[in-house]
């Protein structure tokens, strides 16, 4: 049975790595779903075992955040933030700074994939209206969204996995990884400035902030549902506050997300069916399938054999190992499948420092290449649909520099935190 499980696992992850196999229309979710079904079909797992393998805490957190974010998206909240904040800048360099930090901070609390999905058209519209090359700003958006998302449990899907399985509180997660993200965003600003020096010399037409806001909204066809936002935004803020108070209130983070989602559907002014249609059900299927596939190799003892030979300890070597393996494997299978496989290993290590290092490293590694993270691909696809092309090597030259520098910062900061705390 070990051989069967290993073959299924290998085929599944090959499908995840090579999303377009010859003569097969396959993507990552379908490859994972095939693996999950195969584990049951070939007797590695029973149907009940497969169901119990799914981490419904993670699924619940994802679902709750998706419903909240979908409502804010329909309300036009993302465009409102992007347009208002970016209109403040009166030079291209200030625009770069505002864009980088707005994207990074928004990604920490609103899930980075959703942020870039809705910020990208606004950034392209702003660049065109101000006669600027949008590519440097789009690259800064990608890099900052990934770096910013590392600082909270709700910043990206892999952090949700880590937050649920590690038991680290929302506040502690933010406290420990905030320095990594803030310094990382500063690195992004100066790296983009270095690679695109023309940003420093360009100037905007002389207009006040209100004039720029009006122009940008007209260019982007912005539409805001302020009536709905009066309900959805306070509920979202309440959810974030409750995340920080989850320990004293004895409420789990997934439950808080579901409470917020139910309130926003019940009290919001957007038709619930419209919101639910925008939920990324494919991503939920992807997660559920990965849980089943990994549990299959756990059940037959393959994971235990690996654990017998690989030990992670709360040492310099352990921190370095997590950063190195994250950098390599996140490029191969992407950060979510990589994190799912790492969960059993991390649980045996039983170290909050190593959990935080994994959250930081697996996220930062996504900036190395244009295919390193889902947020990267979302920006590329939207940009191409609007006639803007970001070349692989153009991104790689700046992406690898930012990744290596931010990974060094991550290693140094997590090491200091390990020593001090």
At which residue positions do the language-model features occur?
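Interfacial loop-to-helix junctions that mark the boundaries of transmembrane helices
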Residues: 1-3, 23-26, 48-58, 168-180, ...
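Hydrophobic mid-bilayer segments of alpha-helices in multi-pass membrane transport proteins
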Residues: 3-13, 23-43, 56-67, 229-239, ...
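Small-residue-rich segments of transmembrane alpha-helices in multi-pass membrane proteins
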Residues: 33-43, 62-65, 90-100, 141-152, ...
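Membrane-embedded alpha-helical segments and adjacent helix-loop junctions characteristic
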Residues: 48-135, 281-351
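Membrane-interface alpha-helices at helix entry/exit sites of multi-pass transporters
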Residues: 93-98, 129-140, 170-178, 350-360, ...
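Alpha-helical transmembrane segments and, especially, the helix-loop junctions at the ends
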Residues: 107-117, 134-170, 176, 188-194, ...
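Juxtamembrane and boundary regions of transmembrane helices in multi-pass small-molecule transporters
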Residues: 171-220, 368-371, 375-421
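Long, contiguous bundles of hydrophobic transmembrane helices that form the permeation core
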Residues: 185-271
């Amino acid at each position: 049975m070990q051989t069967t499980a290993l073959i299924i696992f290998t085929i599944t992850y090959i499908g995840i790595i090579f999303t377009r196999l010859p003569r097969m229309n396959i993507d990552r979710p379908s490859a994972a779903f095939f693996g999950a079904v195969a584990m049951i079909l070939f007797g590695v797992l029973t149907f009940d075992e497969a169901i119990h393998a799914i981490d419904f805490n993670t699924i619940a957190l994802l679902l709750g955040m998706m419903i909240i974010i979908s409502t804010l998206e329909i309300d036009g909240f993302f465009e409102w933030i992007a347009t208002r904040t970016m209109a403040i800048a009166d030079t291209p360099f200030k625009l770069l700074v505002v864009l980088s930090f707005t994207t990074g901070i928004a990604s920490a609390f609103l899930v980075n994939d959703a942020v870039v999905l809705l910020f990208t058209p606004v950034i392209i519209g702003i660049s065109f209206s101000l006669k600027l090359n949008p590519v440097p700003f789009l690259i800064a958006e990608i890099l900052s969204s990934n770096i910013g998302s590392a600082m909270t449990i709700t910043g990206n899907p892999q952090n949700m996995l880590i937050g649920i399985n590690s038991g680290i509180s929302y506040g502690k997660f933010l406290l420990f990884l905030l320095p990594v993200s803030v310094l990382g965003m500063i690195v992004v600003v100066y790296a983009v400035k270095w690679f695109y020096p023309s940003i420093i010399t360009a100037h905007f037409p002389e207009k006040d902030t209100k004039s720029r806001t009006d122009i940008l909204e007209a260019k982007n066809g912005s539409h805001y549902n302020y009536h709905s936002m009066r309900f959805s935004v306070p509920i979202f803020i309440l959810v974030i506050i409750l995340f920080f108070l989850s320990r004293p209130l004895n409420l789990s983070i997934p439950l808080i997300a579901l409470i917020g989602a139910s309130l926003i559907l019940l009290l919001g002014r957007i038709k619930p069916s419209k919101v639910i249609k925008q939920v990324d059900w494919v991503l939920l299927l992807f997660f559920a399938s990965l849980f089943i596939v990994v549990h299959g190799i756990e059940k037959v003892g393959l994971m235990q054999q690996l654990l017998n030979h690989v030990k992670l300890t709360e040492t310099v070597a352990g921190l370095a190992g997590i950063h190195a393996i994250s950098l390599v494997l996140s490029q191969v299978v992407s950060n979510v499948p990589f994190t799912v496989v790492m969960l059993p290993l991390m649980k045996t290590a039983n170290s909050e420092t190593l959990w935080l290092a994994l959250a930081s490293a697996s996220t930062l590694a996504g900036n190395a290449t244009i295919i390193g993270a889902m947020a990267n691909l979302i920006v590329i696809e939207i940009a191409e649909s609007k006639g803007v092309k970001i070349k692989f090597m153009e991104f790689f030259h700046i992406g690898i520099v930012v990744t290596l520098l931010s990974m060094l910062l991550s290693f140094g900061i997590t090491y200091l935190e390990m020593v001090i705390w």
